[in-house]
Swiss-Prot record:
Thermal characteristics: Active from 60 to 95 degrees Celsius.
Key word Oxidoreductase present: no
S-S bridge residues: none
Pfam families in the cross-refs: Amidase
PANTHER family per record: AMIDASE, TRANSAMIDASE
Sorted UniProt keywords: Hydrolase
A molecular-function term among this protein's GO annotations: amidase activity
Catalytic activity: a monocarboxylic acid amide + H2O = a monocarboxylate + NH4(+)
Species of origin: Saccharolobus solfataricus (strain ATCC 35092 / DSM 1617 / JCM 11322 / P2) (Sulfolobus solfataricus)
Matches recorded under PROSITE patterns: AMIDASES
Family membership: Belongs to the amidase family.
Descriptive protein name: Amidase
Length: 504
C-alpha cells in the first residue's frame, strides 16, 4: 500500500498533543530517525499477509426478498456446504453478520461496513463446515453490535416473531429470530453484554454464552477482547449442545483462549445433557430480581420455574451476592473505554494480544471512520465521546480499576458456585420492549441498553450463562438464566435439559 512519510508539521502536531515541547531543530532530528525506522515498515508492507486458507468453495448468494424475510432476521441468503459427513449433517445454520465468511458481504449491522467482503472464514465457520453443517444465511445484527435492542440495525430492524409490535432483542437479533421462526436449526451469535441471551429470552429460544475463550473469536468483529464471546443458539438444548461441541476448543489463532484448552471436541456436550442431576444444588440469586425496571410477572415466573427443579431431586435455595448489583457498573468502563480503544482508535482490531489480527477489517473500517464517522450509530458515538474523554482526562484509571474489580466480582460468583452447581436469575428484568421506528433520543438509548442489568456482569467475569425459555406472560416469552462455573457448560446444559423436560 505504500507508507506516506511524515512531515515536520505532522511532528509539530504530535509534539503539541503530547506536551513534548520539542523545538523545530529537535523535530528535524526525529524526522530523520523516523524515516530510517519506517524502512522496516516498508519491508513489512512488501510481505504477503497471513490469511487462513478457505477450505470449501461456495457461491455468492443474494440478499433476501421481502416476502422471505418478514421479521428482518436475514441480511444475506446463501448455501455453503463442507464435508458430506459429520455431527451437523442435515442441520441448517445461520451466522451472525459480525462473523467473517469468505466471499459473503458483511455489514455488522452498519452502514460503516457497506461494501466489505471478507477474504477468510472465521474459525467457527470452518468448524461447522468440517462437521457437514450447511450455512444458509448471514443474520441481521445491531449496528456494530452495541445494543441489546433490535432497532439500530442496518439495513432494517428485526421484529419479534411472537409479536411483531415488539423488538426481538439484540445484538444477535437476526440469529435468534431465524431460529425462533424455523428458518434454521441453529445459529451462531455474539455476546459482549448479553447479545446472545437477550434476544434468546425475548423470542423464546435457548442461547448460551460460553465461558470466555471456550469458543474461538477468530474472524469476528471485536468490541473488546476481554468481553468478546461467540456461542450457540437453538430451539432445543440438544442442538445448543451439539453446536457447542463442534465450535468449542483451542484455536492457535485466538489468544483469548487459555493455552490449556484442548482442541475440539472439548467435551461430548450433546451426550452429557441427559446426565444425572440428582443431588445438584442451585442458588437463586436475590440481587438478580426486583430491579427498578423489573416486571413482576418475569420475576414470579422465573422463581416458580426454578422451584420446579426440586421435582427432579435438585436442591434449590435462595442466595445473596450483593456485588451483582454493581456488575453493570464494573462492565461499563471496560465496555466503553475498551470499545473506544479496540473499535475506534484500533480500527476494529485493537492491540495487545497475540494471534490473528483481521487486517482487512482494520483497513476497511479504519478508512470508514476517517471518511464517514457520521454514519456511526448514536450508541457508538456516545461510546467514542465518553471513552475518549475518560481515557484523556483520567489516564485510563477507570478501565484499569474496573478490570481490577472484575477479579473481585468473579470471586463473588465463584464463592457462591463453590456451594452451588449453578446460579439462577432472570435473563432480563423485563419481557421484550415495544418496537418504535423513531424513538426520542433518550428512549433510543433505553431501548438499546436498558435490559443488560443481569447479563453484562458475566461477560466481565467470563462465566458461562444460558437463557432458558420458561413460559409466556401477556403473549411474550420470559427467560431464566443459568450461570455455571468456568468451563462447566456440561452442568449448565444438564440443568437446561431439565427445564426443557419441565416445559414438555
Amino acid at each position: 500500500m505504500g507508507i506516506k512519510l511524515p512531515t515536520l508539521e505532522d511532528l509539530r502536531e504530535i509534539s503539541k498533543q503530547f506536551n513534548l515541547d520539542l523545538e523545530d531543530e529537535e523535530l528535524k532530528s526525529f524526522l530523520q530517525l523516523l524515516k530510517l525506522q519506517l524502512e522496516s515498515y516498508e519491508r513489512l508492507d512488501s510481505l504477503p499477509d497471513y490469511t487462513p486458507r478457505v477450505k470449501y468453495q461456495r457461491t455468492l448468494g443474494r440478499p433476501p426478498m421481502k416476502e422471505e424475510n418478514p421479521y428482518g432476521a436475514l441480511v444475506w441468503i446463501t448455501s455453503i456446504k463442507g464435508k458430506e459427513e459429520g455431527k451437523l449433517k442435515g442441520k441448517r445454520i445461520c451466522i451472525k453478520d459480525n462473523v467473517m465468511i469468505a466471499g459473503i458481504p458483511m455489514l455488522n449491522g452498519s452502514k460503516m461496513l457497506e461494501g466489505f467482503v471478507p477474504h477468510m472464514d472465521a474459525t467457527v465457520v470452518s468448524r461447522i463446515l468440517d462437521e457437514a453443517g450447511e450455512i444458509v444465511a448471514k443474520t441481521t445484527c445491531e449496528d456494530l453490535c452495541f445494543s441489546g435492542g433490535s432497532h439500530t440495525s442496518y439495513p432494517w430492524p428485526v421484529l419479534n416473531p411472537r409479536n411483531p409490535e415488539y423488538m426481538a432483542g439484540g445484538s444477535s437479533s437476526g440469529s435468534a429470530v431465524a431460529v425462533a421462526s424455523g428458518y434454521c436449526d441453529m445459529a451462531v451469535g455474539g455476546d459482549q453484554g448479553g447479545s446472545i441471551r437477550i434476544p434468546s429470552s425475548w423470542v423464546g429460544i435457548y442461547g448460551l454464552k460460553p465461558t470466555h475463550g471456550l469458543v474461538p473469536y477468530t474472524g469476528a468483529f471485536s468490541i473488546e477482547p476481554t468481553l468478546d464471546h461467540l456461542g450457540p443458539m437453538a430451539n432445543t438444548v440438544k442442538d445448543v449442545a451439539l453446536l457447542l461441541e463442534v465450535i468449542a476448543g483451542r484455536d492457535e489463532l485466538d489468544s483469548r483462549q487459555p493455552d490449556s484448552l484442548p482442541p475440539p471436541p472439548v467435551k461430548p456436550y450433546s451426550k452429557l445433557i441427559d446426565g444425572d442431576v440428582k443431588d445438584m444444588k442451585v442458588g437463586i440469586v436475590k440481587e438478580g430480581f426486583n430491579w427498578s425496571n423489573s416486571e413482576k410477572d418475569v420475576d414470579e415466573l422465573v422463581l416458580d420455574s426454578a422451584k420446579k427443579l426440586e421435582d427432579y431431586g435438585i436442591k434449590v435455595e435462595d442466595t445473596s451476592i450483593p456485588l451483582h448489583r454493581m456488575g453493570l457498573d464494573i462492565w461499563t468502563p471496560i465496555a466503553i473505554e475498551g470499545a473506544t480503544a479496540t473499535m475506534i482508535l484500533g480500527s476494529g482490531v485493537g492491540w495487545g494480544r497475540k494471534g490473528l489480527f483481521e487486517t482487512q477489517i482494520a483497513d476497511f473500517f479504519g478508512n470508514s471512520l476517517k471518511s464517514r464517522a457520521r454514519d456511526l450509530p448514536n450508541t457508538v458515538k456516545g461510546v467514542l465521546m465518553l471513552g475518549y474523554l475518560m481515557i484523556k482526562m483520567y489516564n485510563n484509571r477507570y478501565y484499569a480499576k474496573a478490570r481490577n474489580l472484575s477479579i473481585v466480582l468473579k470471586e463473588a460468583y465463584d464463592s457462591a458456585l463453590r456451594k452451588y452447581d449453578a446460579l439462577i436469575m432472570p435473563t432480563t428484568p423485563m419481557k421484550a420492549m415495544r418496537y418504535k421506528s423513531e424513538p426520542g433520543f433518550d428512549e433510543y438509548f433505553i431501548m438499546a441498553l436498558g435490559m443488560i442489568n443481569n447479563t453484562a456482569p458475566f461477560d466481565v467475569t467470563g462465566h458461562p450463562a444460558m437463557n432458558i425459555p420458561v413460559g409466556y406472560s401477556n403473549g411474550l416469552p420470559v427467560g431464566l438464566m443459568i450461570i455455571g462455573r468456568h468451563f462447566e457448560e456440561d452442568k449448565v446444559l444438564k440443568l437446561a435439559n431439565v427445564f426443557e423436560r419441565i416445559k414438555k
